[in-house]
Amino acid sequence: LFTRVSLRRKNDLDNLLFGEGGRDLGFNEYRVLGTYQEPRVLGSTWNGFVTGFVEQAIRPGFDLFTRGINAQVTQQVTPQVTTSLDYGWGQNNTTNKQLNREDEPLVDRLFPEVRLSTFSGSVARDTRSDPVDPRDGEVLSVDAEIAARTIGSEVGFIKTFMQAFVYRVVPGAPRLVVAAGARVGLARPFVRSVELFPLAPVDSAGLGDVVASPIEVEIGELPLSERFFAGGDTTVRGFALDRLGDDATIDQDGFPQGGNAILIFNAELRARVTRTIDLVGFFDAGNVYDRIRSVSLARIRSGAGFGVRYRSPVGPIRVDLGFKLDRQTFDNGDLERPTALHISIGQAF
């Protein structure tokens, strides 16, 4: 049984994002899960896992409460290669959504609470010298997922996520390590027809809004919980959590909407100064795209910065300061903040 709980101010979303106002504290984020393991299922070379979970997360664009169960079988094909097959069922409830005004009526009615039933599979090759703080090796992985109404999901989509990381000691400089990585995510929702019941204007008798006749519309959107987001301590560090994007995925007030595609590129030079202290310089680039057809390297946004690592018994304690290299102005006239500070445990990638 594993749990995770975070403590923060009990304020509205703006105070969470910008650290303003309020003095009350509350447990606003938590995750509780329990896992049952069955080695060598039915005498095979596959190991089985069944996990139940409940989680509440606070994101810049919405709050997410999710609960569900996941059944997984994994196989160690070689010492470096692992494969897995999964079936997942869950209920996602999104609240406190910050949406584009034109999207609010549609998204609020279709996806306030959505049931997902998915099949997924993955293949990973890992040759890192140390999974916590690698100095040599590579990681390559491909994940694919499908949700469909025929298997009990309320929405359908297909999604894939690919990533590759490489780590090398600089020849002739054993205290220097170069790390680089690339991530690509693509998702395509299945179009379906749904009936909406819009509210008609106030009637002549002054009885208020009345439900008009249903209209049928074609829907091809992903729920908020299934969209890609980026920005933060493990993606592009010049941006705060989920704040990477442009006009298509960040609204007029700076709130992230997520997208159907993502590109992330990272490069980092790690220098060991003492037995417990490392200094790091990094360059990150990427973007979140509203549609797969919108993916373009010309729309990549970037950030650079530096950081400090303290080698603790639980892993590197990390402090990074990222700078945006292409600040933009929101439609409301506000300019993006120039920097983002991140404090975490473990390497960024």
Name the predicted role of every residue range.
Residues 1-132, 138-141, 237, 244-249, ...:
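Gram-negative/organellar outer-membrane beta-barrel architecture
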